[in-house]
Design a protein with these regions (language model features):
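A structural signal for the main folded, soluble domain(s) of proteins
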Residues: 77-83, 112-121, 130, 134-137, ...
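N- or domain-start disorder-to-order transition segments that initiate the globular core
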Residues: 1-31
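Eukaryotic charged/polar low-complexity linker/IDR segments
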Residues: 157-159
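A structural signal for short, well-ordered beta-strand segments and their strand-loop junctions
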Residues: 44, 119-122, 128, 197-198, ...
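Non-heme Fe(II)/2-oxoglutarate
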Residues: 22, 31-112
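Catalytic core of Fe(II)/2-oxoglutarate
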Residues: 5, 147-154, 164-296
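Non-heme Fe(II) oxygenase catalytic core, chiefly the N-lobe of the double-stranded beta-helix
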Residues: 59-62, 88, 99-154, 163
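Histidine-centered active-site/metal-ligand motif
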Residues: 42, 141, 206
């Protein structure tokens, strides 16, 4: 398994910020390795967050169960696993998760994966902090495809591990399996500040299915974020209209005519083939061009 040493240039001087152009360029540098990875597009990046930032994140990890924690004790589908919602964490943690849903991070992931138009999930469905304790596991699985709350397609998973020390004897490695579930093609130790990004579809099989053998009081902790795309089929359901204008009853005739023109243009843009709409616009501009030629 190959890894990359890369740190996002995150400025902590006034909140959390980064340059989206720089993060996209950084992702693009890693894109070829990501897209050619076996058994499906993925990458392992060590040192993804500045040390001061990830140290502070761990310091603010909620030690006690929160009211909205999602707890899994269902065997192969998740055992001794706890999901902590960012909304129940302190202000710094909330700010961090909001940053991870912002343009600089989305730009990095877009540059890395080649998937444009990525969208975050402000509700963190399935995401947030994850914690698994001794005896816990998560069976090999492919993730849900559609976010039912947002009606978006899940495309990319991003995980960052928060485990300062980790022994191979403790198990808990993230396993990536081939589509036929015949061979584990990659095994990733969940070590400190290691990030795993991978594309997700119906056959991106992954999990950590062996029971954790951590000492008492030691948990496997991670940050989990998921990114989505909208479907172009929305154009089959909703008219592709831009801003629609309406004149007021007492507006002058010229204003009413202008508003009708805007509205008519939008309906024509939605109804007509693009080449025909462009032709109509050229014809509309023709009288003005003729008048200018005569004046000159």
């Amino acid at each position: 398994m190959s890894t990359h040493e890369v740190t996002l240039a995150i400025d902590m001087a006034d909140g959390l910020s980064a340059d989206a152009g720089e993060t996209r360029a950084l992702g693009s540098l890693l894109a070829e390795d990501y897209r050619s990875a076996d058994p499906f597009p993925h990458i392992v990046i060590d040192g993804i967050l500045p040390e001061g930032l990830i140290r502070k994140i761990l310091d603010h990890f909620p030690q006690k169960r929160q009211d909205k924690d999602v707890v899994f004790d269902i065997g192969y589908g998740g055992q001794h696993k706890r999901q902590v919602m960012p909304e129940e964490c302190d202000g710094f943690v909330r700010e961090f998760f909001h940053f991870m849903n912002s343009k600089p991070v989305l730009s990095f992931v877009e540059g890395l994966t080649g998937i444009e138009g990525l969208l975050p999930d402000p509700y963190f469905s399935g995401g947030g902090f994850h914690e698994t304790t001794r005896g816990g596991k998560l069976g090999i699985h492919a993730d849900f495809r559609i976010n039912g709350q947002l009606n978006l397609q899940r495309r990319v998973n991003l995980l960052i591990y928060l485990n300062e020390t980790w022994s191979d004897d403790w198990k808990g490695h993230l396993e990536l399996w081939d589509k036929g579930m015949t061979t584990c093609r990659a095994s990733v130790a969940p070590i400190w500040n290691r990030c795993v990004v991978f594309s997700t579809d119906a056959q991106t099989w992954h999990g950590h299915p062996d029971e954790l053998q951590t000492p008492d009081g030691v948990a496997r902790r991670s940050i989990a974020l998921y990114y989505y795309t909208a479907s172009k089929h929305i154009l089959d359901e909703v008219p592709n209209l831009s801003t629609m204008y309406q004149a007021r009853p007492d507006d002058p005739a010229a204003i009413k005519s202008e508003a009708r023109r805007f509205k008519t243009d939008e309906y024509l843009r939605d109804w007509l083939p693009p080449i025909l709409f462009r032709g109509i616009n050229r014809l509309r501009r023709l009288p003005g061009r003729i008048a200018r030629m005569r004046r000159s």
